[in-house]
Amino acid sequence: MFTYQKIIQLALLLSGVCGALASIDTDSHLSPKVLEKLRPTENLAYEDDSLDDDTWRSKRWEFDYQYSGISTFAHLPHVRCLVEQSEDFDIAIIGVPFDTAVSHRPGARFGPKGIRSASSRQMAIRGFNPSLNVNPYESWAKILDCGDIPVSSYDNQLAVRQMTEGYIDLLSRKATASPASNNLKTAGLAKDGIFHPRLITLGGDHSIGLASLRALGHFYGNVSVIHFDSHLDTWNPKRYYPSYWHSDRADFTHGTMFWMASKEGLINNGTSIHAGLRTRLSGTDYYDYEEDNRVGFTFIEAQEIDEIGVNGIVERIKQVVGDTLVYLSIDIDVVDPGLAPGTGTPETGGWTTREMKSILRKLDGHLNLVGAEVVEVSPPYDDRAESTSLAASDFIFEILSSMVKHPLYDVKK
């Protein structure tokens, strides 16, 4: 039942609404009277009287807080680059939500979402990297979050084709930044004579690296691989499983992709390196290490950091890769599972996140990076603090910083 008092209150409310509607001009712009009420008071320092009303009303909503906005990596602009074919960029973040080539725990298909969510505290307004003296989000580079490559979870052969074609599509574009008139650097010049953009992949299980290397091979030929991992990932599939259960489709796993890439001639023989190894080998001898050497890798075991330190690790990597084009592959399980539990094949005795960040920073300026990936983040197995996703997002920040600070050609800034 409406009482007399409630009817009076309703009438007053309707009167106020009608008055507000009447104050709006026919061209949908707010009237000066309403604008005056919306504008900040004169004693607020952030008001810019030089801006017209439309600009002012738009500009005051530009800023996102760390916890607001849709989930893109570091609040970067999101473009579905595979759909928007005319979109160019210098560096793109691309997710590959795939985990059906794992040997143990799944969940890495949720890695791209987890890493993006964990990156929410990275913002242009507070993105300066004091160790590398650069803010990658306020620089010459046009950086986008290009979303994910849609991949099948039912057919791994189809999924690899989707990944490869997606990578080639993105890499085929011309980088946004023009070369400087006095450009003397040609390291990043592709076989077609064009400077192409660079991609950083959010995995996904580690098998996605094969598709990335196939795409890079299309533009650059073979490249060197710096591979941070607790496992070799150069397992010979013919030895790994009994021959009577063998199938060609089963050859492709997150532990065989670098072996396959080497056999396809995608990896430089002798200038690629694993770092952080600490797993068991197959059989009763060192066959896995011998096979790894045959496919062109050398390696650093995790415990060597106790003897030669971070600087020693960095020097070994630099000596191996030299000035070749480099693909940087970081399996999050290189980090000790006590610090990064959210992964599919954890191994105890790993490096700390501080050691990994220090290695990445000390490699800055010494690598011709053509691409990178951070893989094997499995949010379902992460802790309540989302430590694994956070570590992955921080590693990507270091990679982005290095890519921006050291472009593969002299850019016009």
Curated annotation (Swiss-Prot):
InterPro entries: Ureohydrolase (IPR006035), Ureohydrolase_dom_sf (IPR023696), Ureohydrolase_Mn_BS (IPR020855)
GO MF term (any one): metal ion binding
Positions bound to Mn(2+) 2: D229, H231, D331, D333
Signal peptide, first to last residue: 1-22
Catalyzed reactions per annotation: agmatine + H2O = urea + putrescine
Residues annotated to bind Mn(2+) 1: H206, D229, D233, D331
UniProt name for this protein: Putative agmatinase 2
Disulfide bonds: none
Keyword terms: Hydrolase, Manganese, Metal-binding, Signal
PROSITE patterns: ARGINASE_1, ARGINASE_2
Record's GO cellular component terms: endoplasmic reticulum; fungal-type vacuole
SUPFAM superfamilies associated with the record: Arginase/deacetylase
Gene3D superfamilies linked to this entry: Ureohydrolase domain
Entry's EC annotation: 3.5.3.11
PANTHER family cross-referenced by the UniProt entry: ARGINASE/AGMATINASE, GUANIDINO ACID HYDROLASE, MITOCHONDRIAL
Cofactor(s) needed for function: Mn(2+)
Family listed: Belongs to the arginase family.
GO BP annotations, alphabetical order: putrescine biosynthetic process from arginine, via agmatine; urea metabolic process
